[in-house]
Amino acid sequence: MRESLKNSKRLVIKVGTSTLMYGNGHINLRTIEKLAMVLSDLRNEGKEVILVSSGAIGVGCHKLQLPVRPTSIPEQQAVASVGQSELMHIYSKFFGEYGQVVGQVLLTRDVTDFPISRENVMNTLESLLERGIIPIVNENDTVAVEELEHVTKYGDNDLLSAIVAKLVQADLLIMLSDIDGFYGSNPSTDPDAVMFSEINQITPEIEALAGGKGSKFGTGGMLTKLSAASYCMNANQKMILTNGKNPTIIFDIMQGEQVGTLFASKKEEFSHDGTH
């Protein structure tokens, strides 16, 4: 299964705020520059790449020198407005150093749920990829809301990245996180924690390990990643969860090395290869 990843042509890379920012609230320029280099080199190699990036509110807080993240929705959305433009400025600068053009795509749930606008998004992404441009996708935090009558939020960019992967029929979603993969117990408290190399089915037992009832693991962050993995597997797609602190790990994944946790349903092998 890992060997087949070498043939992946269309990739979606998801990067979270924890990878883009230091714990002290400052921007991790070293990681962002490495990420730009890796994705630009994949483009040079002939791969098609889409980046799903969080960080608008985090970068906005840094830009506005806010000591803590605002709690009210209007304030959060104002900070996201500043942060998103700053984030794109940083990406454009670093990708530009490697001769790569990027394009911003901001989405809300109602856009990808509604057939006509969803098709429009698909066409836009295809057009960007055809021109050799790397789309940088984020939720439109400035306008997205989550109300009973009108839900436009995805909830998190983990799910958004899985939705984007399905929209563009990506060969692989690589989710860069602050953990090496999916573990059977919390690696920060259990030195004997074992990481899963591959998961073929999201069972209730797997969900419980991710922070379900009675588990001390995580605060739900891993559950959202499992939801994204489940979404991918239901769409017959593959996802890898791995640590994003050094983005060159993406090269290792593309060489078929045992990096992170691969989520892939067994039926996926039959549907693509015709053999097991």
Curated annotation (Swiss-Prot):
Gene3D superfamilies: Acetylglutamate kinase-like. It is found in: Cytoplasm. It comes from the Bacteria. The keyword Mitochondrion does not apply. Its EC number is 2.7.2.11. Keywords: Amino-acid biosynthesis, ATP-binding, Cytoplasm, Kinase, Nucleotide-binding, Proline biosynthesis, Transferase. ATP binds at K14, S177, D178, T219, G220, G221, M222, L223, T224, K225. GO terms for cellular component: cytosol. Pathway: Amino-acid biosynthesis; L-proline biosynthesis; L-glutamate 5-semialdehyde from L-glutamate: step 1/2. It is an enzyme of class 2 (transferase). It catalyses: L-glutamate + ATP = L-glutamyl 5-phosphate + ADP. GO terms for biological process: L-proline biosynthetic process. One of its GO terms (molecular function) is glutamate 5-kinase activity. Substrate binds at S54, D141, N157. InterPro entries: AceGlu_kinase-like_sf (IPR036393), Asp/Glu/Uridylate_kinase (IPR001048), G5K_ProB (IPR041739), Glu/AcGlu_kinase (IPR001057), Glu_5kinase (IPR011529), Glu_5kinase/COase_Synthase (IPR005715), Glutamate_5-kinase_CS (IPR019797). The keyword Plastid does not apply. Belongs to the glutamate 5-kinase family. PANTHER family: GLUTAMATE 5-KINASE, ISOPENTENYL PHOSPHATE KINASE. Catalyzes the transfer of a phosphate group to glutamate to form L-glutamate 5-phosphate. This is Glutamate 5-kinase. It comes from Listeria innocua serovar 6a (strain ATCC BAA-680 / CLIP 11262). The lineage of its organism: Bacteria, Bacillati, Bacillota, Bacilli, Bacillales.
